[in-house]
Amino acid sequence: ALFLDPPPNLWAEAQSLLEPWANVTLTSQSRLPVLNFQGL
């Protein structure tokens, strides 16, 4: 049998609404530790 965890939750929080691309915090929430995580 193959058991798959649900995909991790991934979202970005912008520090500034006028310039959301200036300072963005990328947050990942997963049940299992992420071995290889690369930001986009």
From Swiss-Prot:
Interacts with CRISP3. Keywords: Glycoprotein, Immunoglobulin domain, Secreted. The gene is A1BG. The lineage of its organism: Eukaryota, Metazoa, Chordata, Craniata, Vertebrata. This is Alpha-1B-glycoprotein. It comes from Sus scrofa. Plasma. Coiled coil: none annotated. It comes from the Eukaryota. GO terms for cellular component: extracellular region. Glycans are attached at residue 23. It is found in: Secreted. Its main location: secreted.
